[in-house]
């Protein structure tokens, strides 16, 4: 999945900031066991990215298993200066993001949706580059 993020940014992550939304293994829990965010964040860091992260309930647990991550107070704080935002866990609040606000705070309007919670045409209307999983490109 880190390669998908890199591809959305032209193949290079070194020196770029990636915002990760959702750290727990599923929504409505603080459980980090086998959370997909752990290998994703490790791979992003191995590729040279700086990682900012936010999760509604899993922040304290994530701090004990993730190193060198800037933990943020909300999705918009997380997006500040990011070259891309990645949705890893499908929390309900991530289904109602204010894309105009995100576009203002992000370095580049790139969304990698690993849970397919948005329709590509909806995100394109907001001027974002949108990558999802298992969907044909249009």
Question: Where does each model-flagged region fall?
Answer:
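Structural/interface elements that position substrates and couple domains in central-metabolism enzymes
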Residues: 1-138
């Amino acid at each position: 999945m880190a390669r998908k993020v890199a591809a959305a940014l032209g193949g290079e992550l070194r020196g770029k900031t990636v915002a990760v939304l959702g750290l727990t293994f599923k929504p409505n829990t603080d459980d980090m066991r086998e959370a997909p965010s752990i290998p994703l964040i490790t791979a992003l860091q191995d590729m040279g990215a700086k990682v900012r992260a936010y999760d509604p309930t899993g922040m304290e647990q994530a701090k004990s298993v993730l190193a060198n991550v800037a933990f943020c107070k909300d999705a918009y704080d997380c997006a500040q200066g990011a070259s891309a935002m990645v949705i890893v866990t499908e929390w309900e609040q991530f289904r109602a993001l204010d894309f105009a606000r995100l576009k203002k705070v992000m370095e580049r309007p790139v969304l990698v949706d690993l849970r397919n919670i948005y329709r590509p045409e909806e995100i394109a209307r907001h001027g974002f580059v949108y990558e999802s999983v298992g969907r044909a490109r249009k």
